[in-house]
C-alpha cells in the first residue's frame, strides 16, 4: 500500500476543474431543455412536459452561470457579480414558475374551491 500526499492546492484545482466541467455540461443541458421546451410549448402543447423542461433547464442554467462567473470574475468583479446574481435570481424564478405549472398540470385546481 502506498501513501500519496496531495496538496490542498491540487485538490482545489481539481475541484475547480470538475465544477467547470459540470458547468459546461449543465450549459448544454440548459440549451437542449430550452429547445425541447419551445417544441413542447408551441407544437405539442403538453403542459406537463414543457413545465418540467422549463424547471430543469432553468436550474441547469444557474449552475452554468456560476461556472461562467468563476471564469470571468477576474476581468470585472463587480459586473460579473451583478450578472451572476441577476441570472441566478431569474433562473430560480423561472424554476419556481415551471414547478407551479407542473403542479397545476399534475393536480388541476378546482374551478370553485368553496363548492364543498
Model-assigned labels for residue ranges:
Residues 2-116:
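Hydrophobic, aromatic-enriched alpha-helical segments typical of multi-pass transmembrane helices
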Amino acid at each position: 500500500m502506498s501513501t500519496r500526499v496531495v496538496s490542498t492546492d491540487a485538490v482545489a484545482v481539481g475541484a475547480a476543474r470538475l465544477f467547470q466541467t459540470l458547468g459546461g455540461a449543465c450549459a448544454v443541458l440548459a440549451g437542449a431543455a430550452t429547445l425541447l421546451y419551445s417544441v413542447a410549448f408551441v407544437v405539442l402543447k403538453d403542459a406537463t412536459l414543457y413545465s418540467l423542461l422549463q424547471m430543469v433547464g432553468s436550474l441547469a442554467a444557474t449552475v452554468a452561470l456560476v461556472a461562467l462567473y468563476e471564469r470571468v470574475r477576474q476581468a470585472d468583479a463587480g459586473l460579473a457579480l451583478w450578472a451572476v446574481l441577476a441570472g441566478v435570481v431569474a433562473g430560480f424564478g423561472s424554476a419556481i414558475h415551471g414547478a407551479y405549472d407542473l403542479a397545476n398540470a399534475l393536480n388541476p385546481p378546482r374551478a370553485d374551491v368553496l363548492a364543498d
